[in-house]
Regions:
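Outer-membrane beta-barrel translocator/pore domains, especially the C-terminal barrels
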Residues: 33, 153-169, 178-184, 215-217
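Membrane-embedded beta-strand positions of outer-membrane beta-barrel proteins
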Residues: 11, 25-27, 98-100, 142, ...
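Beta-propeller and related beta-repeat scaffolds in trafficking/envelope systems
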Residues: 1, 37-124, 133-135, 147-150, ...
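Extended terminal
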Residues: 1-25, 62-63, 190-203, 237-381
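Outer-membrane beta-barrel pore domains and translocons
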Residues: 2, 28-30, 101-103, 133-134, ...
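Extended, hydrophobic alpha-helical segments in both membrane/secreted and soluble proteins
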Residues: 11, 126-128, 138-144
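Short, surface-exposed coil-to-beta transition loops
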Residues: 113-114, 141, 275-277
């Protein structure tokens, strides 16, 4: 039996080659908190970077939360520390082959239950062959490879997460979650360097994600949609609406990472009564977003929250345009009505009305071909 601080180990442990300090082990431990062994300077630098960004973001979040202010700006402060994290010289000398199991393993404040991992290292290349465990009643597994033979460490990793509540992941990092739901994620990434900032700046790869049975807390989508409809109805809203949690059945899409910026070309959100789609970027370097969103009203259209934004048949199939920009902490509260896009919607509706009147005037007096030609005149951009 072995002990490390308050962790008790049992199993086999040995040195296969004393000259090369070749470590071989199969160990089982009750619990281990890896965060306790993070270098103090690195942790202080992380806290300082977080505090600098927080000061900038807090003001934006406070002013934008009501949804009736101008479109928020993206944050500009770096969110990550440039303090070195890995003891590169030590890692180059490692010669190990170990299998570890823990009742609970804490990594970056995340409690992993029934954790198991296999780790091999030789010649400056360290491989995490398999790491898996339970996380907030969901599951995850990961594989990774760290190459420290050169001056700049190169890290590649694949990760799979299933049925993990995303809000618990964010809350563990001390963040207020802008979205809640059960997360499924598959990611394949590559990066280089030896600090948080470097790893984010050089992050490349791809991922697919899906959140089910979730909520957009304090979302103002209803307010923005109602404002757009009221504008076309040429009426003023009686008051401010929204601010309630917006439930969704599924939120999904794919991410393509390029030097720390995640492009999301295919965002889809299924909300009762609404179909939401969009595309945009998430800048992980500053934790900011910039999206174009379209919202289409489906199902029952009789329960809009204000008399000024009642929906009529003319609005069937119309995609209402929103712009969403600002720090990730805002979530859906970063969305505002796209005024330029609304101009195009108004023009389309005006063309539709002209076509309806033309149909009434022409009746059966002219051929279908001529009708189509005349209608086309009004639909040109």
């Amino acid at each position: 039996k072995l002990g490390l601080d308050d962790t008790a180990f049992s199993g086999r442990f040995g040195i296969a080659d004393f000259a090369r300090q070749s470590l071989r082990a199969q160990l089982k431990g009750d619990k281990l908190d890896l965060d306790r062994y993070l270098p103090a300077k690195a942790k202080q630098a992380q806290d300082a970077a977080s505090a600098t960004r927080k000061a900038e973001v807090d003001a934006t979040v406070a002013s934008a939360a009501q949804g009736n202010t101008p479109l928020p700006e993206k944050p500009t402060r770096q969110a990550w520390s440039d303090a070195p994290l890995l003891p590169i010289a030590t890692l180059r000398k490692l010669d190990l082959d170990v299998a570890l199991n823990f009742g609970r393993l804490t990594v970056e404040k995340l409690p992993i239950d029934d954790a198991s991992l296999k780790l091999r290292g030789q010649g400056g290349v360290i491989s995490l062959d398999d790491m898996r465990g339970g996380l907030y009643n969901g599951r995850f597994n990961a594989k990774a490879n760290l190459d420290v033979r050169q001056d700049s460490a190169v890290l590649t990793a694949t990760k799979h997460i299933a049925n993990v509540p995303v809000e618990r992941l964010l809350e563990a990092q001390g963040k207020k979650p802008p979205v809640k739901g059960l997360l499924d994620l598959d990611a394949d990434i590559r990066t280089s360097g030896n600090s948080e900032k470097s790893w984010i700046d050089h992050l490349n790869g791809n991922a697919r994600f899906s959140l089910i049975n979730g909520v957009l807390p304090d979302a103002n989508l209803e307010q923005q949609l109602c404002q757009g409809i009221a504008t076309l109805n040429r009426k003023a809203l009686a008051g401010t609406h929204g601010g309630k949690d917006t439930p969704f059945r599924e939120l999904k899409g794919s991410l393509n990472f390029t030097n720390g910026v995640a492009s999301n070309p295919d965002l889809k959100v299924a909300i009762p009564g609404l179909a939401v789609s969009g595309h945009g970027d998430i800048d992980l370097r500053v934790l900011g977003m910039d999206y174009r969103i379209g919202v289409e009203i489906q199902g029952d259209k009789s329960d809009m929250p204000d008399p000024a934004c009642q929906v009529n048949q003319r609005y069937a199939g119309i995609e209402w345009p929103l712009l969403c920009r600002g720090p990730l902490e805002l979530g859906a509260k970063a969305c505002r009505l796209d005024k330029e896009g609304m101009g195009k919607v108004a023009a389309k509706l005006a063309g539709n009305r002209l076509n309806e009147k033309l149909e009434e005037k022409l009746g059966d007096k002219v051929s279908p071909e001529l009708k189509d030609a005349l209608k086309g005149l009004f639909n040109r951009k």
